[in-house]
């Protein structure tokens, strides 16, 4: 209502201003004066009302401004709160992942701790066993006692081999008038001197030659062949005695028969004939072997030469057992002599 009155008052004033230029009749002067007076009173009343309403409007404007400012602040705070909520959610997810990782690591750590405890227990047991072993080594059944027993065993082996050497003496034919025993070979090494030829070595006074075994002819001396077969029988018997003394199972077993000795091969390089095959039955399977003759009486020279090769391999096996190598693939007597010499040497007792 106040605004409507103000508008009407302003319109009346504008009208009065337009009418200032009019000529007023005297009769109408009172009427106009009354109208002007009423307009002035209305304007004064409107001004007073304006002055009264102005503080109220200003206060309302301030309240509205403050409300708007606070609304904006609340909106900003709400946005910050939403951002904090998102950050809290992300942090919560990360905490859950970290918690799961921590649980897994705790499980792994507990497993490792258990393994460590088991390892510590095992280590403690091993340490106790080691201490017991050290006590045993230092005691009567220790290394010193083992060494003493080993020395006694080696001396016994030397004695037994010396008996074999006494039964089957090996000599070198040094000249037409004298023989030199192989035991008197000079030399600083365990091998002694270089091996001599097969014809210069004799076993129990009998020589051995590979010539009949490599090439048999009509003019071959039968006595030489028989002596070689007998010498090989002696060598085979000596090897069959020495091998058990050393506790070495020879690779190619021997069937002793003096000058008619055979040697067995379970994997022959020569294809055998059906008549040569001899079966041996074991608990699990049948194993066939071939016997090769160590003599030439009615035998194939190739098979006999192969038998000599196998016999030399047995001697080489014994040489390797005592830490030496063979003197040669055909040095049967020299290899046997070298084996006996090494076993009878003082260094053999301390050989490990």
From Swiss-Prot:
UniProt GO MF annotations: phosphatidylinositol 3-kinase binding; phosphatidylinositol 3-kinase catalytic subunit binding; retromer complex binding
GO biological process, one term: protein targeting to vacuole
Membrane topology: Peripheral membrane protein
Gene disruption phenotype: Multiple aspects of auxin-related developmental defects in leaves, embryogenesis, cotyledons, silique phyllotaxy and lateral roots in addition to unflattened and small leaves associated with an altered genes expression profile. Altered morphology of the VPS29-associated late endosomes. Enlarged multivesicular endosomes and reduced level of organelles enriched in PI3P, associated with abnormal trafficking of vacuolar cargo and its receptor VSR2 leading to erroneous cytoplasmic distributions of endocytic cargo (e.g PIN1 and PIN2) and seed storage proteins (SSPs).
TM annotation in the entry: none
Main location: membrane
Keyword tags: Auxin signaling pathway, Cytoplasm, Developmental protein, Endosome, Membrane, Protein transport, Transport
Gene Ontology terms: cellular component: cytosol; endosome; multivesicular body; multivesicular body membrane; phosphatidylinositol 3-kinase complex
Domain of life: Eukaryota
The protein's role, per its UniProt record: Dispensable for autophagy but essential for efficient targeting and degradation of biosynthetic and endocytic cargo to the vacuole. Required for seedling development and plant growth as well as for seed storage proteins (SSPs) vacuolar trafficking. Controls multiple aspects of development by affecting late endosome morphology and by regulating vacuolar and endocytic cargos (e.g PIN1 and PIN2) trafficking and distributions (e.g. polarity), thus influencing auxin transport orientation.
Subunit structure: Component of a complex made of VPS38/USL1 and PI3K main subunits such as VPS15, ATG6/VPS30 and VPS34. Interacts directly with ATG6/VPS30 and VPS34.
Protein name stated in the entry: Vacuolar protein sorting 38
Annotated source species: Arabidopsis thaliana (Mouse-ear cress)
Protein encoded by which gene: VPS38
